């Protein structure tokens, strides 16, 4: 499976989940990163919402969280970030197509 197919599959799965982490005016800090790591261990695919009062833009927040937690950015749209853990991303990319 190519990276684009893996991304498509993970985005399809993300439609069924609600955001579990919210980034507010405090931005990305150690507590937020710890929460993201815990959520990824439990769920392997999470949505993060960046609220309007956050000082940084969504793309910057996504890059900061991914760098601090070792996660992979699946998609960034509007104020929503979809993240997955590295292991899930690698396993999705290595799956064979059912063709």
Question: Where do the protein language model's features map onto the residues?
Answer:
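Positively charged, polar, low-complexity stretches
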Residues: 1-99
């Amino acid at each position: 499976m190519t990276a684009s197919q893996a991304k498509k599959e993970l985005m399809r799965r993300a439609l069924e989940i609600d955001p579990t982490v919210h980034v507010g005016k405090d931005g990305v800090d150690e507590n937020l990163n710890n929460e993201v790591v815990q959520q990824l261990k439990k769920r392997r695919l999470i949505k993060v919402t960046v609220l309007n009062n956050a000082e940084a833009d969504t793309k910057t927040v996504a890059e900061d969280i991914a760098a601090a937690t070792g996660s992979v950015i699946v998609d960034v749209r509007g104020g929503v970030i979809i993240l997955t853990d590295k292991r899930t991303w690698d396993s999705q990319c290595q799956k064979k197509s059912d063709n």
